Amino acid sequence: MFGTAPSLAAFFAWTLSLLILMEILRTRLVMTGQVPANGFSPGNDGLSPFLQRLARAHLNCVESLPVFGGLMLLAIATHRTAVTDPLAAVLVAARIAQSTIHLVSTSAPAVTLRFAAFAVQLAIAAWWAWSLLRALV
C-alpha cells in the first residue's frame, strides 16, 4: 500500500493528468480550426459536455488539493505519517474515482456515486485533521 508521500505524488500526478488531457483536447480544437486560440473559458463553456466536465473535474482536484494535500504535507513535515499512511492511498483512490465518474456520466446514480467518493475523502480528511491536532497539541 502507498504511504503518504507516494499518495501525495499520485494526487499531484492525477491532477496534472487531467490538465494535460484538457490541453491536448483544446490543442486539437485549435489545430483543426474549430476554436480560436483565444476562444476558451476556464470552464470550457460552449464546448462539448465532456470538456466542460473535464474542466470541472480538474478544478475539483485543484480546489481540494490545499486541504487534502496540506494535511499530508503537515503529516510529513511533523513526522506524523503514522496518522495518514493507512488511508492515504484510499483518499487518492476515492479522488480518482470521483473524477472518473464525473467524466463518464451525469446520471443520478453516477452523481450519487461521485458524492460517495467525495464523502470518503471528507471523512478521511476530518479524521486526519482531528488526529494530527491531537498529536501536535
Task: For the regions a language model picked out, list residue spans one by one.
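N-terminal signal-anchor transmembrane alpha helix
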Residues: 2-40
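Short alpha-helical packing/oligomerization segments
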Residues: 70-93
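Helix-boundary and loop/linker segments of multi-pass membrane transporters
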Residues: 1, 41-46, 77
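Core segments of transmembrane alpha-helices
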Residues: 59-73, 125
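A loop-to-helix transmembrane entry motif
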Residues: 50-65, 86
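Juxtamembrane boundary at the C-terminal end of a transmembrane helix
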Residues: 126-137
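Hydrophobic residues within alpha-helical transmembrane segments
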Residues: 10-13, 58, 89-93, 116
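Interfacial loop-to-transmembrane junctions
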Residues: 97-123
